[in-house]
């Protein structure tokens, strides 16, 4: 039995996901990073899963918060589907030990990279849908993953993204706005990894990383907010 076959047949993994695949090759595809194969990888499943996740979360929020306006519902959805939230879901599902990566990607810490983990969660969502053809079943599975986070989310301004919150924090105190600068880009488009430096008056430079400049800037802003709010 190969390592990948063991992962796919591991009842603990399937139990954490909450679904038994009829076509286990779909799960294997959902766990396979582009570094292993340019053709056989999770990217198409991720594309499908991203749309399905957005719809499932939007539908949940629409019914759970009947009196909230479109703006707040949009911010709540963004909070629940962003990379950071998906990274937490991946940690709950213990996906890092199950990723199928190239040796180089593994050595560089790819199995702990939040962007890869988030992409994998979306790919698994796409795989479950293709395997089951059952949107209601998929909805139940995804919302079960999200239960710890749905129980605590509130339609408040704190649901704004870190860059918006940091800007408002500084504006309220009449301080200069943050300056963001890309200091490193690895890989080729559209599969690049960005490192951004954020400078806020009175603080040391803080770095953030992500699969896009926007994600990297958000990560840096989140770290600065942690320092400012201590």
UniProtKB/Swiss-Prot annotation:
MF GO annotations: metal ion binding; ribonuclease III activity; rRNA binding
Pfam families assigned: dsrm (PF00035), Ribonucleas_3_3 (PF14622)
Positions with a binding annotation for Mg(2+): 46, 119, 122
Keywords attached to this entry: Cytoplasm, Endonuclease, Hydrolase, Magnesium, Metal-binding, mRNA processing, Nuclease, RNA-binding, rRNA processing, rRNA-binding, tRNA processing
EC number, UniProt record: 3.1.26.3
Annotated active site: 50, 122
Signal peptide from the UniProt entry: none
rRNA processing listed as a keyword: yes
Main location: cytoplasm
CDD domains with a match to the protein in the record: DSRM_RNAse_III_family, RIBOc
Domain DRBM, chain residue ranges per copy: 161-230
InterPro entries: dsRBD_dom, RNase_III, RNase_III_dom, RNase_III_sf
Biological processes, Gene Ontology terms: mRNA processing; rRNA processing; tRNA processing
Function, in words: Digests double-stranded RNA. Involved in the processing of primary rRNA transcript to yield the immediate precursors to the large and small rRNAs (23S and 16S). Processes some mRNAs, and tRNAs when they are encoded in the rRNA operon. Processes pre-crRNA and tracrRNA of type II CRISPR loci if present in the organism.
Family membership: Belongs to the ribonuclease III family.
Subunit structure comment from the entry: Homodimer.
GO terms under cellular component: cytoplasm
Catalytic EC class: hydrolase
Protein name: Ribonuclease 3
Cellular compartments annotated: Cytoplasm
Domain RNase III: 10-133
Catalytic activity: Endonucleolytic cleavage to 5'-phosphomonoester
Cofactor: Mg(2+)
């Amino acid at each position: 039995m190969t390592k990948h076959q063991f992962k796919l047949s591991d009842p603990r993994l399937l139990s954490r996901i909450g679904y038994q695949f009829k076509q286990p090759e779909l799960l294997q595809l959902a766990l396979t990073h582009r570094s292993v194969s340019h053709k056989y990888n999770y990217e198409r499943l991720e594309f499908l899963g991203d749309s399905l996740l957005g719809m499932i979360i939007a539908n949940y929020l629409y019914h759970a918060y009947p009196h909230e306006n479109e703006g707040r519902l949009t911010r709540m959805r963004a909070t629940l589907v962003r990379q950071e939230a998906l990274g937490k879901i991946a940690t709950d599902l213990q996906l890092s030990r199950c990723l199928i990566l190239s040796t180089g990607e593994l050595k560089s810490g790819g199995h702990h990279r939040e962007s890869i983990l988030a992409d994998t969660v979306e790919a698994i969502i796409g795989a479950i849908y293709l395997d089951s053809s059952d949107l209601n079943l998929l909805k139940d599975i995804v919302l079960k993953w999200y239960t710890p986070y749905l129980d605590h989310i509130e339609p408040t301004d704190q649901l704004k993204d870190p860059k918006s919150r940091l800007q408002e924090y500084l504006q309220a105190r009449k301080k200069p706005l943050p300056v963001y600068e890309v200091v490193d880009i690895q890989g080729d488009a559209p599969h690049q990894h960005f490192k951004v430096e954020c400078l806020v008056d009175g603080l040391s430079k803080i770095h953030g990383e992500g699969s896009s400049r926007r994600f990297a800037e958000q990560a840096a802003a989140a770290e600065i907010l942690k320092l400012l709010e201590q």
